[in-house]
Each structure stands twice: as C-alpha cells, then as structure tokens.
C-alpha cells in the first residue's frame, strides 16, 4: 500500500487554470510516415532564424558550397546557419522571410547543383568522454535552436542552465489542433529522440528527466515506452489533452507543480525544457556530426491532396513544399505558417522554410468558416476564464487600444503567451492576440528608446566626468609647476643655502690665536675688496647712464642757451634799475663767480667729450638762435618798461649769468665743430647781422633815453659790459665763418 501511494505521489500531475478544447484535426497528417521532398532548384537561407543577432557572413557570391557548410560564423548568441544542399551562392541580398509582415531580411541564395554532397562529417559516438563545454560548443556551432517555435539558441540555453538544473523536461505535448510534426517524429525516430535526451542529460546532470506527452498520441506513447523499457532514468508522463498544455510555463506546472516567477525563467526554479525536435537535432549534431539543415514540417489542410509530415530542407520555398503535396488553392486561399491558434497568415508563398517552421496549414473555405466582423466588447469575462496565464484580456484590450502602456505593463501583458485562447472564446470576434502583439511591440520600442537615452546620458556623464578629471589634473600640474622652482632657481637657492650654512659654520667655529702669531684676515680683506670693487662698478655704470642721459639735442641746447641769455639780460636790467637793499661783499661775489665759471667749464668738457647723436643743420640752429634772441629782447623790453614787483638777489643773478655764459660757449663750440650739410648764403647772413645790430642800437637808445629810477651798481655794469663784448666777438666770428 505504501508503494502504491509513493508511486501515486511520484506520478502526480497538476492542472492549470483556463485552457480550451478545440476540435482535433491531427488525424489528417499523422497517419503517414515521414517522407523526403525533392530538392528545390533555389534555396533562400535567412541569416537570422533564431532569437538574437545574425551571424557574420563567411561566404561570397560565386562560392561553391556543400551541404552542412557554415554560411555564417556564430559568436556569443549569434547562431550560424548552414547550406541545406550543395550548389553555388548566386546572391546575398534581402528577401522576404517567415514573418506576419513578410519583412525582408538579409539572406544567402543558393542554386542547387542536384548532387547534394555533404561536408566531411565527424561524429562523436563516445560523447560521454567529452567535456561539457565541448558538447555545448559543438551544439552551438552546428546551429541547433529550439524547434518548438521559440528559436532560442540551444547552446546558450544549456550554458545558462549551469549546475542549478534539477529537472529536465522534454516537451512532447504538441497541443495545436493540426500540428503532428513531433508526433510523427516520435513514432518514426523514437530511439534517436531518446539518445538526444541522454546527451542533454549528460550535459546538465539533472536529478530527474521528464517527458510530457498528451494522451491524444497513443502510437508515439507506445513507441517511447518500448524504447524506455529498460531505462529508469527517464520518466514518461502522459497528461490530459488540453490547450495550451504545450506552453513552457503550463507544462512546467503540470509536471512539477512549480510556477515560473513573473519576469523570470524556468531555470530560476531549477527547470530546463527542450522540445522533442530539438533533442533529435542534438543527437544528429553530436553523434552524426550533421549540422541542422532540415526539419520535420506538417503539411495539412483540406486544400492539400496529400497531407502528411515531410523532411523539409531549410530555405526551401513554401510554394515548392505545397506543390509537392498536391496543393489545390481556391480563389481566396490562405496559407498559415504554424497552427490555427498561434500561427500567422503568409502574404505570399515565396517565403522560405526556417528553423521555427513546424506546420503549413492550407484550409479550405468550409474548414475555417466565414470571417466574422469585429464587434464591441461586452465584458462577458469569457476571455479571462480561458486565459491560462491568469491575466485579464479584456483590460489589456482596452489599455492596448488606448495606448496606456504603463497600465498594460502593470497588468503583466508580458506574461501573455499569445496562445489565442481568449480570441477563440470571444463572442465579439475581437482579435485580441493581434492587439496584444502590437502593444508588446510598442512597449519594446519604448524601452529600447529609453535604453538608448540612458546609454547616451551615461556617455555624456562619463564625458563630463572625464573633462572634470582632466581639468583638475591640469590645474594640479599648474599648481605644482608654480610651487616647484625651476632648475636654475633650485641651483641658486641651493648655492645660497650652502653659503648661509658655511657662514653659520664659520661663525660658530672658535677662533684660536696662538701666542706670537697674528690672525689670518686675508679672507675678510678679500671679501671687503670685492664688495668695494662691485660698488665702484655699479657707480661707474650709473655715471655712464647719467652722462648718456645728459647728452641732448644740440638744437634744444641752442634754444635753451638763448633763453638763458634773455633771462640774464632781464636780470641785469632789473638789478641795474633796482636799488640794492644791502651792500654785497665783493669777495663773496668773486668766489661765487669763480665757482660758476668752474661748473661751466666742467659742463663744457663733458659735452665736448660726448659724441653728438646726430648732426645739426647750422641754418636751423642759426634761425632758432635768432628767434630766441628776438623773443629775449622782446621780453627785456616788456620787463624794462614794467615796474619790478620785488628785489632780486645780486649773488643769484651773478651765478645765473655765469651759467648762461657757459651754455652759450657750449653752443658756440657745437656749432663750430658741426660740419654744415650745405653752404650758407653770405648775403642772408650779412642781412641778418645788420638787422640784429640795428635792433641792438635801437634797444640801447631806448635804454639810454629812459631815465633810471635809481643808481646803477658799478659792478653790475661791468658784468653787463663784459657780456656784451663777448656777444659782439661771437657775432664777428660767426660772420667771418659765413663769409668764408
């Protein structure tokens, strides 16, 4: 009794909510064995026949290929595709593929040569001696994908399972009403299917292996039991017929009682599922060394004269398969790829067979009935009762129509398996699955855009962070460069520090003077002499700078001399007219005059030794001197007529007169030494001299006629007479020079 209860608990199955029981139409095609189809003349092989990116092309137009030769390279999740037969690559171009919209995808077009030659095949009959990674890589490189309809790369799926898989489930339910591809494969190739299951078990090392099959396949069940008669590691579970019990989540719950978490995978609960056709493809890839180049396809429907299951080469046009089965199309004939509930209508028949093509249904007009017009939802909740995923299809329908993507996501539209049970029971004939597919596509597009925006933002923030780091590093370098002295500065600083240390050492070192000896002060004396020499050099340099600065323009010097003479005459007149407030000591005046003459001679010598910066034009100098004299006489006349406001110191006047005479002599020497650039007209010079003498006589008469207000000092008069005689001599010399 205990063994009976243990066996009952061991073989227990669970039931999922919802589901439907559509009419069974499997008997149309499951009664005849698998057969081969004649080769087509042209094959179209899309590069992408699986979930993921397409592989990298490794053939070119014009290449000769053999059956099983790779057309692309598979890296990562990129699954390679292989040539279905031998022939020549005639084109690599976009071509319409198995898609509801017949989207064009890049494809390799091969013209068959009819020989159907294989590449050299290397089978691994002793696969148990191979490492797990080697087997997974071989399965991946031989292009094996999920043949149940999803098309997920099998190698990637096995790699992702890892060591956490406890239960391996082989899906043999095949719940669609018309499809019998897996049923017929198990009837004809049960041993090969079981061998493929053992290879998968060797890779995953699960605790249990379960085969789930519906009870509407008695012949397949009997064949599997016969193969598994002597095996105790694989358990065959027969489950009730109910649509969609072949769904991955539904079959997992039926066999294990475990539910796949929302948004998760079956591997999260220790379960991995593979299709019957996938197990057979794994066997051929590992043991026989044959890449996947063909699969079993069900040809059924009342519009086909010879329904059944055939070995269809990948890339074979649908039209070729249907014509071989006796296709008799009507006026409005439709062809469905897949089952009537989860399949889609083909826009035309030139699309190729791919890895996920399991059925081609060509129903008659009476078989599917007249198309019904879509009506408004009546909120009957029949769709919610039939949903195997426990969703609310009527709410998802409203959210999909209203573009309310957030609410649709909140109501778990991603969990919809698109089984079509809701649309099957809908009394309003609403194509709910179409709305859900469109809504999921829009949500996927929105998420893709958000992902791109997030990546762009991350790149921008990374760039900003990089720029900030570079800026901070640049500022740090500048600070370091400013703080750290240059090499020369370092040397100077080091030398200064060395001198300071040496002086400190010398200062702290005691001086010992022995009896009878004199201290050695030679170093101190040498340092003192060096400082004196340095000071003298600086003083000489400063003196040279000052001497260079004192060398002025001769023309400016002539003007200044004329102005000085005018001031001297003005001062003499003021002193002659003014009464001295006090008597002047003759000795002091003589001393001051001698000092003034000495300063004047010194100034003349410095200017005579200095080289003039540029040659002076004698005519310009003479004109400027005449203008200066005229201005001086005019100023003298104005000042002689005006009453002096204050008394002038006679000593200061004598000094200024001596300085003026010195400047006048300097100007005469410069003009005498300067070489005239061009000859001066003697007549003009004589005229100017006559005019000057006339003006001088006129001025003397005016001064003679004027009544002196006060007595004139005899000494001042003598000085003025001497100045006048000097000016007369100068004028005479200038006249002689001009005449020569």
UniProtKB/Swiss-Prot annotation:
As for subcellular location, the record says: Cell inner membrane
- Which residues are in the 4Fe-4S ferredoxin-type domain? 369-397, 407-436
Cofactor(s) for this UniProt protein = [4Fe-4S] cluster
- Pfam assignment, any one: SLBB
Q: Which UniProt keywords apply?
A: 4Fe-4S, Cell inner membrane, Cell membrane, Electron transport, Iron, Iron-sulfur, Membrane, Metal-binding, Repeat, Translocase, Transport
Biological processes annotated in GO: electron transport chain
Q: Relay the cofactor remark from the entry.
A: Binds 2 [4Fe-4S] clusters per subunit.
For this protein, the Enzyme Commission number is 7.-.-.-
- Residues annotated as region Disordered? 602-716
UniProt GO cellular component terms: plasma membrane
- What is the documented function of this protein? Part of a membrane-bound complex that couples electron transfer with translocation of ions across the membrane. Required to maintain the reduced state of SoxR.
Could you identify this protein by its name? Answer: Ion-translocating oxidoreductase complex subunit C
Give the quaternary structure: The complex is composed of six subunits: RsxA, RsxB, RsxC, RsxD, RsxE and RsxG.
Specify the domain of life of the species encoding this protein: Bacteria
State where [4Fe-4S] cluster 1 binds.
377, 380, 383, 426
Q: Which GO terms describe its molecular function?
A: 4 iron, 4 sulfur cluster binding; electron transfer activity; metal ion binding
Q: Which family does it belong to?
A: Belongs to the 4Fe4S bacterial-type ferredoxin family. RnfC subfamily.
Q: Has keyword Iron-sulfur? A: yes
Q: How does it sit in the membrane?
A: Peripheral membrane protein
Task: Enumerate the residues binding [4Fe-4S] cluster 2.
Answer: 387, 416, 419, 422
């Amino acid at each position: 009794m205990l063994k009976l209860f243990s066996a009952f608990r061991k073989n227990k199955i669970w039931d999922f909510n919802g589901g439907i029981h559509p009419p069974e139409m499997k008997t149309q095609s499951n009664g005849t064995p698998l057969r081969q189809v004649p080769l087509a003349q042209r094959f179209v092989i899309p590069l992408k026949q699986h979930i993921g990116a397409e592989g990298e092309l490794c053939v070119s137009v014009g290449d000769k290929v053999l059956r099983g030769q790779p057309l692309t390279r598979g890296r990562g999740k990129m699954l390679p595709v292989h040539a279905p037969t031998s022939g020549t690559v005639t084109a690599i171009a976009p071509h319409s593929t198995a898609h509801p919209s017949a989207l064009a995808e890049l494809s390799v077009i091969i013209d068959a040569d009819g020989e159907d030659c294989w590449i050299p095949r290397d089978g691994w009959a002793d696969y148990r001696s191979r490492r797990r990674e080697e087997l997974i890589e071989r399965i991946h490189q031989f292009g094996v994908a999920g043949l149940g309809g999803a098309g997920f790369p099998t190698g990637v799926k096995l790699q992702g399972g890892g060591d956490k898989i406890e239960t391996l489930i082989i899906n043999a339910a095949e719940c669609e009403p018309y499809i019998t591809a897996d049923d017929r494969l198990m009837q004809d190739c049960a041993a090969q299917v079981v061998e493929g299951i053992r290879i998968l078990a060797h890779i995953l090392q699960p605790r249990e292996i379960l085969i789930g099959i519906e009870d509407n396949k008695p012949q397949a069940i009997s064949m599997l039991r016969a193969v598994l008669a002597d095996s105790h590691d694989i358990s065959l579970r027969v489950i009730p017929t109910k649509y969609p019990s072949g769904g991955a989540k539904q079959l997992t719950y039926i066999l294990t009682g475990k539910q796949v978490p929302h948004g998760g995978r079956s591997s999260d609960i220790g379960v991995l599922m593979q299709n019957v056709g996938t197990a057979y493809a794994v066997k051929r890839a590992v043991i026989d060394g044959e890449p996947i180049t063909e699969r079993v396809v069900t040809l059924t429907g009342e519009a086909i004269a010879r329904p059944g299951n055939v070995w269809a080469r990948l890339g074979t046009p649908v039209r070729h398969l249907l014509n071989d089965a006796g296709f008799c199309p009507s006026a409005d004939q439709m062809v469905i790829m897949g089952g009537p509930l989860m399949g889609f209508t083909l826009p035309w028949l030139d699309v190729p067979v791919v890895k996920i093509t399991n059925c081609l249904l060509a129903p008659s007009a009476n078989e599917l009935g007249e198309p019904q017009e879509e009506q408004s939802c009546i909120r009957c909740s029949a769709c919610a009762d039939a949903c195997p995923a426990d969703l609310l299809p009527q709410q998802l329908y409203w959210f999909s129509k209203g573009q309310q993507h957030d609410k649709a996501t909140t109501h778990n539209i991603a969990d919809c398996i698109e089984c079509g049970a809701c649309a099957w029971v809908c009394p309003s004939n609403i194509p709910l699955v179409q709305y859900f597919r469109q809504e999921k596509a829009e949500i996927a597009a929105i998420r893709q855009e958000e992902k791109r925006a997030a990546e762009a933002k991350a790149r921008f923030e990374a760039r900003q962070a990089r720029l900030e780091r570079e800026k901070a590093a640049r500022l740090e370098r500048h600070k370091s460069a400013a703080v750290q002295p240059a090499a020369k500065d370092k040397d100077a600083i080091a030398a200064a520090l060395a001198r300071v240390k040496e002086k400190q050492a010398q200062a702290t070192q005691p001086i010992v003077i022995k009896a009878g000896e004199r201290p050695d002060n030679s170093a101190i004396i040498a340092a003192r002499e060096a400082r004196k020499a340095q000071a003298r050099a600086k003083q000489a340099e400063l003196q040279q700078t000052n001497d260079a600065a004192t060398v002025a323009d001769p023309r400016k010097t002539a003007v200044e001399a004329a102005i000085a003479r005018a001031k001297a005459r003005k001062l003499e007149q003021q002193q002659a007219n003014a009464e001295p407030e006090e008597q002047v000591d003759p000795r002091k005046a003589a001393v001051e005059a001698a000092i003034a003459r000495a300063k004047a001679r010194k100034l003349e010598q410095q200017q005579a030794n200095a080289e003039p910066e540029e040659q002076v034009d004698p005519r310009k100098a003479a004109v400027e001197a005449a203008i200066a004299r005229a201005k001086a006489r005019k100023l003298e006349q104005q000042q002689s007529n005006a009453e002096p406001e204050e008394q002038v110191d006679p000593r200061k006047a004598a000094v200024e007169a001596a300085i003026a005479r010195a400047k006048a002599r300097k100007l005469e020497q410069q003009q005498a030494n300067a070489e005239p650039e061009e000859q001066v007209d003697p007549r003009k010079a004589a005229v100017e001299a006559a005019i000057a003498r006339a003006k001088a006589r006129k001025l003397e008469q005016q001064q003679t006629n004027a009544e002196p207000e006060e007595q004139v000092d005899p000494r001042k008069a003598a000085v003025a007479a001497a100045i006048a005689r000097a000016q007369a001599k100068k004028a005479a010399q200038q006249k002689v020079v001009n005449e020569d």
